[in-house]
Amino acid sequence: MILCLYVDDILIFGTSLNVIKEVKGLLSNNFEMKDLGEADVILNVKLIREGNGGVTLSQSHYVEKVLSCFGFSDHQPAPTPYDPSVLLRKNQRIVRDQLRYSQIISSLMYLASATRPGISFAVSKLSRFVSNLGDHHWRALERVLRYLKGNMSYGIHYTRYPRVLEGYCDANWISDADELYATSGYAFLLGGGVVS
């Protein structure tokens, strides 16, 4: 049994419908509660149930909304979210459209933390330049949006197995000689999908 709480919303997950009903009964006896049935979307994340007991978390509708909002619906897709040959440095010229850049970064951070961990590195790298950006930062940011355009349907798929927590990590302690920034990353998987 898993209970997920967010402010005044509760998701109840379990393998037995009887146990879920019992938990709902206990909660409704102690709190004012409204049962909305099976959840389809929560916090802009679609829950897609598979016939084999798996579930996929997707934000394709949110990606579409972000691309439309920032005028990237008609752009050509990019194969990867980040080009490692591009060296991002502090801007030495006039800052270009800082507010819009930070709005896009915020939208991408939400995607990266919810269902699109594959863009985390690029978004993290680009967020370092929110207060000091130039044209090369914009081109790199546009690449992330173009990558999402080509992969809107991507999400995180969870299966019943394996029931083992797997963890992976890596680090590059001095990857940027100009700024002396260290870069590290990690991923923990459960049921075949990323949980952290």
Q: Which residues are covered by each model-predicted region?
A:
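Long, low-complexity, charge-biased intrinsically disordered regions
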Residues: 1-196
